[in-house]
């Protein structure tokens, strides 16, 4: 893993998000890019915190780059949200996607299914 990507909203950014960025770095990512929704979130509303605050939080936590997921994709279905994020990160040369899950067992099952 040289270039890790995270597709997210960070609405709001919390310690779990910081741990995710740190885990990507400790796993060998030389660069971590975050593709983040801007002025709209997937639930169709506006974020709790402005984009500038969420970008600063990601950078302060160790992300090297934050790019914006355009609002039409941020407000779309989960599949379209993720697909647009994957395409943007792939265009930058991202070779690994990093994700989290509220249920650790689900994350392990997903990881095993895609090995």
Where are the model-predicted features located?
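Nucleotidyltransferase catalytic core that binds NTPs
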Residues: 1-114
């Amino acid at each position: 893993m040289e270039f890790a990507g995270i597709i997210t909203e960070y609405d709001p950014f919390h310690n779990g998000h910081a741990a995710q960025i740190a885990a990507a770095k400790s796993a060998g990512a030389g660069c971590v890019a975050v593709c983040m929704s801007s002025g709209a979130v997937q639930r169709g509303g506006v974020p709790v915190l402005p984009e500038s605050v969420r970008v600063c939080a990601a950078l302060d936590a160790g992300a090297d780059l934050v790019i914006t997921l355009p609002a039409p994709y941020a407000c779309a279905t989960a599949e379209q949200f993720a697909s647009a994020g994957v395409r943007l990160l792939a265009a930058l040369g991202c070779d690994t996607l990093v994700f989290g899950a509220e249920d650790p067992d689900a994350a392990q099952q997903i990881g095993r299914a895609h090995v």
